[in-house]
């Protein structure tokens, strides 16, 4: 998790990457991300949900995910909070396969339900220490 960048960003978007970062290196990663955000910058994270059995099966059978260490949403929130990133919004997403796309319009009502294939978290940089 090497981030040698000398710029600041209003938004950092991390899509299905955290599970490839070793759990022992995640704290340093989020410390660096915090430092890369502008004063009122936001971090948007999109990750696999380890509570979804289909996601677990797909990750287990994917060679690209051989090193994957899935992270629960609550653990992601905790490590971000420890690094002064305040949760603004979160939810679970992708409940139905494409064959059931006629259900896609109601997925927004299930954000609270922990069995979505993925989840998202939106954090804001907390400058108060």
Locate predicted features.
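A short glycine-rich, Lys/Arg-flanked "PGG" loop and its adjoining helix->strand segment in the class I
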Residues: 27-42
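Local beta-strand N-terminus motif with an aromatic residue
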Residues: 8-10
């Amino acid at each position: 998790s090497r981030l040698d960048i000398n710029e600041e960003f209003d938004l950092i978007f991390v899509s299905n990457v955290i599970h490839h970062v070793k759990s022992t290196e995640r704290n340093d990663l989020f410390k660096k991300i915090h430092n890369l955000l502008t004063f009122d910058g936001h971090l948007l994270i999109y990750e696999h949900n380890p509570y979804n059995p289909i996601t677990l099966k797909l990750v287990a059978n994917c060679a690209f995910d051989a090193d994957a260490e899935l992270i629960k949403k609550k653990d992601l929130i905790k490590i971000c909070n420890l690094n002064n990133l305040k949760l603004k919004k979160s939810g679970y997403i992708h409940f139905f396969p494409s064959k059931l796309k006629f259900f896609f319009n109601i997925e927004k009502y299930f954000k609270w339900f922990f069995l979505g294939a993925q989840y998202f978290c939106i954090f804001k940089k907390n400058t108060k220490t």
